[in-house]
């Protein structure tokens, strides 16, 4: 739970903790940096893992990190671009300033800023900001999930034959023994799409699709989104049925009616 001292900020008639307000403010500051560089002729470098990085990635993470460390100097920080400090702190911030840098570089709007707060291993605040696409989602544990200022809930569809499922990166799944299980899911459901990145989690939380499956993610990509889906009433685990943690690399997220059946089809061991 959030500490009592963190509560008490009110905006737009809603009570928000200081933790959430700082996360929202940090994401807004990053959005200003991102808009400055978006669709500009920006230099792209490659990190050691061959993923792209730009000045926009680094500068937007710097403004997020400053906002957080100014407000909470004793908290830990784990960022995609500027590294980590205090991973064993009671409170740990998880930040990806531009999740979807390839989309950003190529000038299409499917990228986002992800800011989450973990308290003793559990995500308690999550903000997902997509400044070019024009969506902002957030959640605070026990307080519900919100998309563009409106509360959101997962769908109530109960049959796979009526469900829409979105997949992200499935490279590991494709090279393993459960690829045939995924094929059975594809055969069973009404629609398969690959909305990807932040967007399919926003759709899931808003009740517009029923499930998301990914086999190749990192915690910075999905920490905030996991809480948003859970607070919207969904279930969010990895493909082993484990809750989200620093080592999470895969996702099975769905509404509560369909999660058990999807977990069985995909042979999720601890669901």
Language model features with spans:
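DPxDG-like acidic metal-binding loop motif
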Residues: 87-146, 161
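Generic detector of well-ordered alpha-helical packing
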Residues: 58, 62, 81, 97-100, ...
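N-terminal subdomain of lithium-sensitive/metallo-dependent phosphomonoesterases centered on the IMPase/IPPase/PAP
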Residues: 2-98, 257-258, 264, 271
